Structures are given as C-alpha cells and as structure tokens.
A protein has these predicted regions:
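Hydrophobic residues within alpha-helical transmembrane segments
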Residues: 33, 83, 134, 138, ...
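Nonpolar helix-loop interface/hinge motif
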Residues: 1-54, 111-115, 176-255
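Short, highly charged, low-complexity non-transmembrane loops/tails of multi-pass membrane proteins
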Residues: 284-302
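Helix-boundary and loop/linker segments of multi-pass membrane transporters
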Residues: 18-21, 66-75, 118-123, 161-163, ...
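Perimembrane loop-to-helix junctions flanking transmembrane segments
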Residues: 53-72
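Selective recognition of hydrophobic, aromatic-rich stretches within alpha-helical transmembrane segments
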Residues: 1-5, 40, 44, 73-110, ...
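Hydrophobic alpha-helical transmembrane bundles that constitute the permease/transmembrane domains
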Residues: 36-39, 90, 94, 132-140, ...
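Alpha-helical membrane-spanning segments of integral membrane proteins, especially the hydrophobic core
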Residues: 76-77, 81, 115-143, 169-177
Length: 302
C-alpha cells in the first residue's frame, strides 16, 4: 500500500501522473464511457455551427454589425451548444466519482476494476448533479453581485473624475476575481467529500469542503491552476500546434489531428481529478490524520 501523507504541490502533480500511468487503460475506458457522448455531440455540431457563423464573421471582419434577424439562424445552434455543455458538465462529475474509486483502490494496493468505478459514479450521480447545479447557481450569483458592485463603485468614483472611475473599475475587477476565486477554492473539494465520505449530503459537502480548505485555499488555487495548465492547456497547445503545422504539409492529416483534439478531455480530465483527489487526501491528513484504514472502511474494502 502507498502511505497517505501530507504532500506539496509538486508531489501532488507527480502522484497524479503516477496513478494515471499505472491505470491509463482504466482511466481511458472510464473517460470514453463518461465523455464520449457529449464530445461526439460537439464534434457533429461544430461543422453546421461554423458554417452558420461564417456569414456573420465576414460582416464583423469588415466592420459591419449584423442585424438581429441575421443572428436568428444561430439561435438553435446556441441552444444545442448549451445543451451539450450541460451534458458534458454532468458527465464530468460521473467521471470524477469513478476516477476517485480508481485512485483510492490504487492507494489501498488493490487492483482497480472498471465495474467498481462505474458503480460508484452511478450511485453518486443524483447528489453530484445537485452539487453541480449549486456551483452553477453560486457562480451566477457571484458574477451578478460582482458586476453590480463594480458598476456602483465606478459610478460613485466617476463623480470625482474619469481617471478615478477607470482605476476604481480595475480595482473592482481585481477584487471580484480574488473574491470569486476565494469562494470557489473554499468549495473546491465538494465532489471528493460527497463521493468519499459517508452520510454527507449536497449542502453538507459544501460546508465540509469549506472546513477542510480553511487556511488552505491558496494551495487549492495553485493546485487547480497548475494542474489545469500542465494537464489541459499545454496538451491542447501542443496538439493544436501539431495540427496547424500539418495543415501546411498534409491538410487532411491536419484536419484529423485537429478533430482528435476535441477528444483530449478523455485523457486530460482524469489527471485533473487525480490531482484534486490527492489534494483532498492531503487536506484530511493535515487536519484529521486521515489514513488507509479510514479510506478502506469508506470504500467497504476489507
């Protein structure tokens, strides 16, 4: 068994890569099961969406503002994009729960099974959807509150002068970003809490996450940011760069590589989940002496 111990950011990222490498087949299968539907939906939608937007893009390019009637053909596609985003968002929570089972079994020295991962993900879907909806509502309220606050601040400072108003607006944006990041980092491990702790409901998961991240929100922020850059942004840049380079050499091959880039979340998403799950273990170890016996009991492993 691998000991659960306090970890620094580098150890969390290294541990996530190690666990992923050991179970790459399982993570890939789980990613395909969870995300293939939404990603295929987006792949089929991208062609018609692009073709419908091209006339509008041409008008915008030459400096003309399209009329409302010209935008109307885009509305059905925008509705489908919203539907796809909702499906992807919910599917990502199923993937997260299943991936946590694989990660936890790896820590316990057991051989992870795809069936166990799917079973845990399916059993947690209803409360995880609740968490997902609560996070969307929270982000929406934060966005509305921050916008209102910035507008009011800029308006008041505008009575002094335009320069002061601009400075106040900039300070407001910085403050709003900090506040939103602070709140979301506080609720950064709600999915892990709901999946890996017994008897915790949706709202209890938010309270529990806030308690675990107390005085550790900066670590949550850096873990999420760095893992997002390393496991998402850099792979996308590399793949899209290769696709662009191949376009000049072999356009069909370039298009194939570009199309495959849409399926990168199948590979990348489990890495993000692994990093955040190891962060959750780290937070519990530091606060509660979390160990393998507790994890084993939670998963029902003898």
């Amino acid at each position: 068994m691998t000991d659960i111990k306090p970890m620094q950011l580098g150890e969390i990222l290294d541990g996530a890569l190690t666990i992923y490498r050991r179970n790459v087949g399982l993570f890939s299968m789980l990613g395909i099961i969870a995300l293939a539907g939404p990603l295929i939906f987006f792949a089929f939608l991208s062609g018609p969406l692009t073709r419908s937007f091209l006339p509008l893009a041409e008008q915008l390019r030459v400096g003309r503002q399209p009329s409302l009637d010209q935008w109307q053909p885009m509305l059905p596609f925008l509705g489908l994009v919203l539907l796809g985003m909702i499906l992807y968002y919910i599917a990502s929570y199923f993937l997260a729960a299943g991936a946590m089972r694989i990660i936890s079994d790896t820590y316990l020295g057991r051989r992870p099974q795809l069936g166990d991962a799917i079973s845990l993900g399916a059993s947690k879907m209803l409360p995880l959807v609740g968490v997902a909806l609560c996070k969307v509502a929270l982000l929406t309220l934060l966005w509305i509150g921050c916008v209102i606050g910035i507008v009011v601040l800029a308006t008041i400072m505008g009575l002094i002068g335009k320069g002061v108003a601009s400075l106040a607006a900039f300070a407001g944006f910085v403050g709003a970003f900090w506040f939103a990041a602070f709140v979301m980092c506080g609720y950064g491990v709600t999915t892990q809490v709901l999946t890996l702790e017994e008897g915790v409901g949706v709202f209890g998961a938010f309270a529990r996450s806030w308690e675990l991240t107390r005085q550790r929100k900066l670590k949550v922020f850096w873990t999420a940011l760095v893992s997002g850059i390393v496991f998402y942004f850099i792979p996308y840049v590399v793949v899209l760069g290769v696709a662009a380079a191949l376009q000049g050499i072999s356009p069909p091959l370039g298009r194939v590589v570009g199309a495959l880039s849409q399926f990168l979340p199948i590979v990348c998403a489990p890495l993000i989940v692994s990093a955040l799950t190891l962060l959750y273990y780290d937070l519990r170890v530091r606060r509660e002496g979390f160990d393998l016996q507790i994890l084993s009991q939670r998963l029902g492993v003898g």
